[in-house]
Amino acid sequence: MSSKEQQAAGRDFKRNSNAYSSLPPTGTGAGCSGAALGSGTGTGKRARSKQHQLEHEQFGLSNSLSSESIRQACAYYDDELSDEDLIEIQQTPQAFHQQTKQPLQLQPISFRLGDELGDERSAFCGSQEMQQVPLSTPIKQAAETDEALCVLSELDAILDVHDVSQLNGTCSSGSVNSGSDDDKVEDYLMDLDNYLEEMDNALNREDSLIIIDGHTSLKREPRTRTLPLSRKKKSSKKKSEDQEAAQGDFQREHQLRKTFSCSLRPTSQIASSSGSLETSTEPVMDVWRRQSMRRALEQEDTKATVAMEREEDDIPTLLVELPPRRDAEMRRCFSQGDCQASVAPTVGSQMLTEAHIFDNLLQTNARASSEEPRPRQYGRRLEGPPTPVRPLILAQSRPQSAPTRVQMREPQLQDTPTHPIMSTCSELSSARSSRMPSPVSLPSDSSSSGSSSAEHDQEPDPVQTTTMCSASSTTPLEPLHQLQLLLREKCGFNSQWPHAGSRTLALIGCTLGVFNMCRFAVLTINFGGNFLLQFLLLSVIFGIPLLWLQMCLGAKIRAGPVSMWKISPICAGVGIALVMQQCFLALYSTVSLAWILVYLRDVFPTAARSGYRWQEMAFPYRYDASNATGNLTQTVAEYFNVVVLQRLHLANHPDASGIRFHVNDRQLAFYLALIWAAVFLILCKGLKSLGKLAYIIYTLPLVALAVVTAKFVYVVDPSRIQNIFAASDFDDFLVNSNSWTAATQETFLTWGLLGASVIAITSRSHTNANKAALRRDAILLVLFTLIGLGLMALLALCCAQILWQHGYVYVPGSFENPDCYTSIYSLQSNTNPYLLSYPRSLIPHYSSFIGETYRRNRTMIHVESGFQALRFISEIFPAVLSLASDSISWVWAAVAFATFAGFGLAQLCVMWKPISSALGNSTSSVLLSCVTGLLLSIPFATEMGISILYYVDFLLGGSWFIPIIWTAQIFGVFLIRGRPYNGDDLVNDLRLCGSMSAFLALSWNVLLPIGLITLSVVDYKASLSNQFYYWRGKSYFTYWSRKMGSLIQIGVLLVIPVTAIIQIYRYLAHGPPDILERIQLLYRPPEEGEEPRRPSARQTASQSRRNALGQTTEGGQHDAQNDAPPKYTPPPSYTTATGARLAKLLRQSIRRSVRRVLGDSSRTRPVLSLDAESASPAAPPDYLTILTNPAGSSFNADPSPASSSSPESIEIDQRPVGYSQRSQSLGRKLHRSGASTLERRPYTAEDVVTILRSSVRHRQSQGGGNLVTASTLPRPPTAAMSTHLEDASFRSIENLVLNAEPPDRTPGVELELELEAGQAEECARNNTSVI
């Protein structure tokens, strides 16, 4: 070869060596070009690398590529296609799943991307035998034009037209070509390069595409622009041969234009070396894999959501297998990661001219502009081999023969820590089914799709996995998993409990506080053992089930007492009323804790006194000088009223002011501030701080109570312990109404009063909590509560025995004046027999939250209320400590009062927790709530604070309207909302035994509503609350206070209906266009992640029925009418016809409304399920497929073998006559096994026609032969059908029509009946109609 030829060969494609990868040349041209290059060098080093260059030149356009290799690489053939070839082209996707290997065939290329960044991003080639598909189609008939096809075709045309003689020369020819021809070829190649750059600019604007076999979503990376035309003619610096040998494939730092090709069969000249050719392709392809994947990772957009797929078994890769043809090659072009395939058809002697290219581009643009967008496709409409559909892909992007790919928009980034996994199914919708949107999609089996994700039964991940099976779907799917919804909440404050036992200890504060412990102690002293047994019995029947119901609601709904009514917004007023009532309880009960701190302060001895302060005289001038110590009967009562309550006006003290609403001593205000500061420190970090301190504020008081009780038992004379229950008269167990009233009220105040806090506490759990955690908490809470109350009852009985030993007796007093607030009397000094001998068990009693009311003198109820707060701490316990000071030191007294203060602080924290959470989940909201609570509790620390305390406690503390609110909650949850929050479902969360679960369900549904209403009546009578509503008679309260009290009690109850009215206005004024949808959102909104019913489904079904009626009328004109004409019937009058029609419309409207409101699942249409490709799809409605003809014989339409083999035919099997899915009340269903329905496809419109036609009336033919006709609408059932079959038939027909897929969405159903030969064509023509 001359030097000029060598220079021309060196200039060929040298400037584009970094922008092109090559096509494999066939024949000897490639080898000769390499030999010529090797001979031109003349050095031994080039001779050693000669063979290495030959191997690489088989795969790439090297710097020294000869004209013959270009000719062989760009060769194309145009064979005329036969009819068989065209059929095979259409059936090419059916061969995607075949995987038989051909030994001498190179492998088509597919991609599989790794999940992790650290994994090797590999692309592999697989060879699989498939059906024969022609490699080319005529240009004007091609559906789409590939980018790589256009590039190679233009290159081929330019080379053939302008330098045919030069390209046809071999490497051994010694002819000398002119320099002008070489320059001309180079100029055309540079023009082609500019054309490719313009194509790159257009392709860069395309959206990112997802490869079907890939695991990640990669955006299209732009190519690096080549040099300008002025600089392209400058020759680049020549690299050394060592660098060419080491870097003969690709350079890593450049954006490459990759054009890769593999030959299915080598030409005859190199057929003997096919084995070595296969071997030589592997290293080059391996390097190409690494570089392309690295380049894709570098250009990946960080804002794009990385789609992660669940771990699946080996899914067959979709590969296109092309048959081997002699002297034919297949070009596979990969443009920046997109899988595209294309071939260019020509005849062997015909050249591709510029006119052909221009015409082809015009046709492509016309097709792209005329292509209409297609809406989203729900579900799958075609079983069998996947059919490629490209509604959103450009016309030039890929050929028909390439594997199907899916184009989708980038999903928006979620705010949650985890993202839903988008799994793209390989089974796509057909072109016919993508035209119209479908509001209803029936679940279908995925047994025919080997790559469907429904074939893999896997446990659900914490991150929601959604399956997307539509090629044109661009709507992001919503995650459904409950754990992902929980992760959206603010973490670190009220998200979860820090320890496993924190929730259990916090729940103890709801049932075990200083107030109910003091009440329980005093009631045990007054009523004895009868009260204990009655309380235990009522707790088992009513109290404990009520507590467990609140725990189950909190754990099930996972929301607070107000936000829990997202399940039924119309009942939100119930939660607001409960929180309001509990807020008032927390405000006025705080001052009682300040009283305990005053007692704790005065326990410690000082230098001025050696004993307790309540042993000294409060006012020495009131007593004789001889009585220095004073009477214990007076000192204990005066200490509480004067020193603790600061009621200085009672003793005419000089420091007393004329204004009773005055803070005489600021000690109570200081203790109130100290208490609220402690509450803030405990709740400042939400559940995190409360859970950590729960082990201190709940455990230590309980342990200290046990220690103090043991000490008092030790002090009591052992011989008198056996007489503790001797005073109890068990004969009055059933007849003493006062005892039963006290036990009933105490049961509710202990187990149900603070239910709002129970719901708020149980709505959160520990991170590692299992399903049995709720049962553990429920059982431990009951045990700890009963133990605490039992210890307190034992302590109270010991104190009563100590008083009896020292000659004192306890008689409940009243707080009003010194004459009545004394409660400890000495048997020696007091001689009033009426006061000492009156049995305490017969005194009328009423319990409120912080105190009790005993009406000793019924004639003076308008003067003495009989109320006293914390009777055990303010009346009994200080007197016992004074009498037993020799055996019980002040240390034990300090421990006892500290224990009571700890119980009170713990209960105040759990009461204030839902109130502070209502303002917000932050430290500032807790601080704001605590400061507000401090300011609102200051009035109770004034001189008249005890009077205000009694008034508020009488109105709100355990009043008659509180049980009514809890009754409304039970009705709202069980009746208005219903499933899945009824008793049968909630009781399963406790995981108790069968008998206990049945009893709880019975108690929640029947016993609790009855018991709460009865308790409301009992409270109303026992508390004398009628004085608030009868303003004429005498009363303890003033006229204005009675009006205010009635307004407060009724106002709390009116919160429920007022909130319901507001919610009705909000939901009916705004929302979905369908009024029934709005009503459903108001009463029974769908759960989070559950799609509401679609009103468009009913409209579509109605439209389908109207279409069916119209088509039936047209088709009925051709049917033979053999029946005799009916007898004459006079037409109805206008009034009768109009009234009947209106009555029918009204009846149908009421039925639809009731079904929508009650959620009757027997009439519910199946809606689109986001997990339609899940492993266990829901079974379609049970349709009746056995229909009977007038003769009474069973008619079964079995497809013929020809139709059954077609993928567009179905098989209608015979089912049992019994209707196995009959609806029950309140939406319940008899569950049936779906084994017979899970293996069949959903019914389409054509299926419905076929099934309904199987119930036709067989009419006799006219004029020879029997004519069997089919009617679209079924006739009413005859008398021969049974009643059961008659009822099931109409229900099945209605379900068939309502649940059928819309027409024109799936291929028609071909059902060939067993007809006579003369009527086969007519039957087939009738079966093509749609409803």
Curated annotation (Swiss-Prot):
Pfam name, any one: SNF
Deletion phenotype: The imaginal disks of third instar larvae are dramatically decreased in size. Overall larval size is unaffected.
Biased composition (Gly residues): 28-43
Keyword Transmembrane: yes
Chain coiled-coil ranges: none
MF-aspect GO terms: amino acid:sodium symporter activity; L-amino acid transmembrane transporter activity; neurotransmitter transmembrane transporter activity; neurotransmitter:sodium symporter activity
Transmembrane segments: 505-525, 531-551, 567-587, 667-687, 696-716, 741-761, 778-798, 890-910, 926-946, 956-976, 998-1018, 1044-1064
Topology term for the membrane: Multi-pass membrane protein
Start-end of Basic and acidic residues biased regions: 369-383
UniProt entry keywords in alphabetical sequence: Coiled coil, Glycoprotein, Membrane, Symport, Transmembrane, Transmembrane helix, Transport
GO-annotated biological processes: glycine import across plasma membrane; neurotransmitter transport; R3/R4 cell fate commitment; sodium ion transmembrane transport
Record bears the keyword Membrane: yes
Compositionally biased residues, Low complexity: 437-453, 1197-1209
Gene Ontology CC terms, in alphabetical order: membrane; plasma membrane
UniProt feature, compositional bias: Polar residues: 16-25, 258-282, 413-436, 463-473, 1097-1115, 1186-1196
Protein family: Belongs to the sodium:neurotransmitter symporter (SNF) (TC 2.A.22) family.
Protein name (record): Sodium-dependent transporter bedraggled
Source organism: Drosophila melanogaster (Fruit fly)
Gene name per UniProt: bdg
